[in-house]
Amino acid sequence: TGPEATGKRRRRRTLQDVLAAQVEEIKTRYRAIQPLLKRVMQDSPNESQSRLLLDRILQDVLGYSLSEIKTEQKIQGRAADYVLAPGGVDALVIEAKRIGAPLRDKQIFQATSYAAYAGIRWALLTNVVNWQLYRVATEDKVEADLVFALDLQGGLDGDSAYRLMLLSKTGITRCELLDKLWRKKVALSQESLIAAILNEEVLNKIRAVLLRERGYPLTNQEIQDAIEREVLR
């Protein structure tokens, strides 16, 4: 095989290529169902009609089969509107509200309670148009932390399409993608950044820079006090 034959070989697809293709597929599928979503919203649908539309999105946009969409699940007195089980593995609990109904964090309690008992790490609160994904933690007590929120009403840009892809059958089976997004959110949280800034190693660096640039020797405690007083107030 010469250089010409080698050049003709298809470049091996990277994970980024695969994910980009899946995001484009999500955009295409969503565009197909968007007119129906707009039409239904104008009719002030009830909860039953809202569920039917959510079913369509789960199947036609997110790629779940009927057998992977389990409804009205119960376990030890805890209930879930939906449990998504790609490949038969329970992966996401959904609390579904009527289209356009206001969403509040406390509404996710039932889904997170079910998820915690069933060993599921992700719970979704949605009114079909707005989607809020939570990570369920059970270390000391059951807690639900918001990972991201989506508004589908105006269509999908690249970022929202990627996040919707993470909730699709292909996305949620790659559980490391949601984990990665969650770790990034935690790393960039105010609590994490403050802890990093006030770390002894960072304070040492700041002390050295201030000595070099300003010519005044300071202690780490003096620097920490000033940061807390002047920067983090």
Where are these regions (language model features)?
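Short beta-alpha junction loops
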Residues: V128-N130
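Acidic beta-strand-to-loop metal/phosphate-binding motif
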Residues: L124-T126
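A short, conserved, highly charged catalytic patch centered on acidic carboxylates
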Residues: T1-W122, L133-R233
